[in-house]
């Protein structure tokens, strides 16, 4: 399994309705891209100085599934929308469920 994480810091002048539309469009990707095993998206709740504004965590069966998602036309539309309203975007993709990973339960 591969876990894909993306975080967005929106431009200061971007209205809340536009931010909500971005998150809604991200969440809708799971219904139209079959390679998505699971997807969670939402807004930052702590609002600390170091915080980004929203984030996405998606899980894919393998690298081929993640690559198919990456080039899917619906994903590319949302990527363009997100870039247009963001001052910063960061992402990381890592293998999950095998190898040197840890799960911590409290």
Task: Give the location of each predicted region.
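Short S/T/G/P-rich N-terminal loop/turn motif that feeds into the first structured element of a domain
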Residues: 1-53, 61-71, 94-106
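Short, flexible helix/strand-to-coil boundary loops that buttress conserved ligand/catalytic motifs
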Residues: 70, 79-82
């Amino acid at each position: 399994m591969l876990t894909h994480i993306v975080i967005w810091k929106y431009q200061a002048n971007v209205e809340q309705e536009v931010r909500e539309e971005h998150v809604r469009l991200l969440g809708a990707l799971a219904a139209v891209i079959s390679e998505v095993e699971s997807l969670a998206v939402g807004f930052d709740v702590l609002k600390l100085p170091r915080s980004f504004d929203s984030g996405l965590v998606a899980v894919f069966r393998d690298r081929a599934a993640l690559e198919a998602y990456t080039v899917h036309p619906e994903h590319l539309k949302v990527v363009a929308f997100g870039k247009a309203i963001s001052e910063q975007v960061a992402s990381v993709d890592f293998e999950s469920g095998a190898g040197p990973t840890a799960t911590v339960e409290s």
